Amino acid sequence: MATYKVTLINDAEGLNQTIEVDDDTYILDAAEEAGLDLPYSCRAGACSTCAGKIKSGTVDQSDQSFLDDDQIEAGYVLTCVAYPTSDCTIETHKEEELY
């Protein structure tokens, strides 16, 4: 099992924290275990409350069913169903940008 460094950032929220996330753990779950309060709703990849935007690195979010190909191509990620596949930086609280 690999462990990656995931940096979660959001200037408006005053968030800039790096956490270690195993490659079989969803980023949202690891953030909560680290004491971070990120937005979420369904926890099943079927809404956009937990949306973030990848600034660097890669994730596996094949369990999600909400984002379309264009949104994924633009770097959007649903943190509740995203596993890290490399060290990555994700800007959080991006739901409003999807619409």
UniProtKB/Swiss-Prot annotation:
Cofactor binding annotation: Binds 1 [2Fe-2S] cluster.
Domain 2Fe-2S ferredoxin-type: 4-96
Classification via CDD domains: fer2 (cd00207)
Binding site for [2Fe-2S] cluster: C42, C47, C50, C80
Single biological process term from Gene Ontology: electron transport chain
Task performed by this protein: Ferredoxins are iron-sulfur proteins that transfer electrons in a wide variety of metabolic reactions.
Protein name (record): Ferredoxin
Upper classification of the organism: Bacteria, Bacillati, Cyanobacteriota, Cyanophyceae, Nostocales
